[in-house]
Amino acid sequence: MKSKIKSIDHEVIREILQKHDKRVIFEKTNVVPDESELREELEKVLGLGHVSQKSVLGLDIYQYSSYGEFEQMLIPFLFKTILNTTIDLCIDNHPFIFQNYSREQIEKNFISTGDGGFLIFDTPLHSLLFASNYAIVLRIYNAFHFFPRLRKIIGGISTRYAITYDKVYNYHDNFYGRAIINNARILSRDSLNRCLIDEHVHRWFTVNIDGMENLQVITIDDVSHIQDFSNYSTLPLATGSDKIFGRESSRREGIINSDILKIGKIKAKETDINIYNLHLQVSLSLVNNDDESQKKIVTVSLGNLNTTGI
């Protein structure tokens, strides 16, 4: 079972500094101090080895600054509305996988950037499913099925995606860590509206489902046997259905196509991280909650096939 995000206590660190350091020191002779005792105490408190890995999904509205000032003022509302709708879809469409999440928890683990943001999940599969449902909502908005008059005012919206998997921690109700840093770096380097993932995400899918190409053939039973879901309740498997991973393998709905290609590297500290371009085609059956007689099957692409490097 995934551990909680580690929280760093400001007061604990301050007390250690009061014990092993001085806030200000002015001496006639400058001396480089021995920091070994302070380092040892800080390492015990921070517990770097116990900082859990989390998956971060980065969403960025492409060329937000190119919209008019009036439209720019409306886009944060639109993004928030699409995000809330996506949260509801994920909880409804994937009762087994998202059983440990509520809308409040997902919103709490969201870092807003104004024209997008970062969502923190336990596994890359959570991030991928959220991105897929988001792409569905974005498509019905762009196709004038979701607030069509607002769509006419603002215009079409494009989003670029990034998924990373690394350490994340919490300090003063803010989130930090390499997963967030690398995600922001990937998004800033992409100008082609793709869905990019790092090598840690790629490795997670390779270990757990024998590669991302198998997303189009695995079942919800296969998902339930992934190690990260071993402590999940199996009750949702009996009482509900997953809208992407069926009980039997099918390419009529859910993920009907998946392509993955390595496109380059980014620098992270002293190491290089391989970056992959992911392209999925996802088909979902949607029902209008305001009028359940209205139904529609929507197929979208998450990412694209542009293989230009990063």
Predicted features by range, described:
Residues 1-42, 192-193, 199-310:
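Intrinsically disordered, glycine/charged-rich C-terminal tails and inter-domain linkers
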Residues 29, 33, 54-58, 109, ...:
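Functionally constrained cores in energy, signaling, and assembly domains
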Residues 122-255:
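Catalytic beta-strand-to-alpha-helix segment of the class III nucleotidyl cyclase homology domain
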Residues 20-133:
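Catalytic NTP-binding/metal-coordinating core of nucleotidyl cyclase/transferase enzymes
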